[in-house]
Each structure stands twice: as C-alpha cells, then as structure tokens.
Amino acid sequence: MKKQGFPPVIDENTEILILGSLPGDVSIRKHQYYGHPGNDFWRLLGSIIGEDLQSINYQNRLEALKRNKIGLWDVFKAGKREGNEDTKIKDEEINQFSILKDMAPNLKLVLFNGKKSGEYEPILRAMGYETKILLSSSGANRRSLKSRKSGWAEAFKR
C-alpha cells in the first residue's frame, strides 16, 4: 500500500532537522510525526530539550520544537510499505531536499533517525550540512532507552 509522508515542520529559524524515513500506520491515522505510542521519539527528544513532550498534545510538541529551533521531516515523500518496518519500504520517492535552503536558511545540522533514513546522509552532507545518524527511536529498536538517550544527547552537541 502506498503511503504518503507529511509536510516538513520547519521554518526560517530551524537550525537542526531530524529526518525519519516514512510515517507508519498509526502516525498516518493520527496525522502526527512519531504518533505510535511505542516509539520513543518524544521521550528521547524531551530529555534533550528538557521538556516533558509526552504529556502535552501534538500541537504543543511542535511548538516546543520550534522554540528549540528543531524541525522534522522524512527522507521519503511516499513509498509502499506493509506495516511499520523501515526494511519493508519499497518504491520510495525521495523528498526534494533542495527546498531546505529557502525554507530553513539557518539549518546547520541534519540528524537521521535510524539506519534507513541514514542511508541518505551523503546527500545532505554534500549539500553542506553537518550530519549525524542516530540510533532509531522506534520501539522495534532493541537497544536500551538509556543507550539511545546517550547517543542522541551526544548528537545534539555542536
């Protein structure tokens, strides 16, 4: 089944962009980035910016990101995938990253949430951005939350 990604959550103040792969079924139903309750994205990011992002509604989460100059987007504009596993994404269409120069002129750091999105790291690095690949926030990631928190915190240091 073909799935459509979400528009970018970025503006002219965005300095850090986190790129996922493609929204999963629950996120698509909720119309929210990282909408699956088993995904640790909001917990991990909240620990970095010092806010409890899990206890606030989605719109307030996005506002917290903007206050912290953090944007969200996905590598893929669309793709076919059964279920939620990144390894099952096929026939993907890549987003047009060239728009970042105009939409987020202050963007400096692009973080890739997991291996699948990280496969596209060379493209963003070639555009002149600092890049880092994060351990996936997915609930399917078998690494401990503590290990992922440490890796994420290190990636945000500049």
Swiss-Prot record:
Its EC number is 3.2.2.-. It comes from the Archaea. One of its GO terms (biological process) is DNA repair. Gene3D superfamilies: Uracil-DNA glycosylase-like domain. GO terms for molecular function: hypoxanthine DNA N-glycosylase activity. It is an enzyme of class 3 (hydrolase). The active site is at N39. CDD domains: UDG-F6_HDG. Disulfide bonds: none annotated. InterPro entries: Hypoxan-DNA_Glyclase, Uracil-DNA_glycosylase-like, Uracil-DNA_glycosylase-like_sf. Keywords: DNA damage, DNA repair, Hydrolase. Changing N39A: Abolishes the glycosylase activity. Changing D74 to A/N: Retains significant activity on the G/I substrate. Signal peptide: none annotated. Excises hypoxanthine, a deamination product of adenine, from double-stranded DNA. Acts on double-stranded DNA containing G/I, T/I, A/I and C/I base pairs, but not on single-stranded inosine-containing DNA. Also has minor xanthine DNA glycosylase activity. Lacks any detectable uracil-DNA glycosylase activity. Belongs to the uracil-DNA glycosylase (UDG) superfamily. Type 6 (HDG) family. This is Hypoxanthine DNA glycosylase.
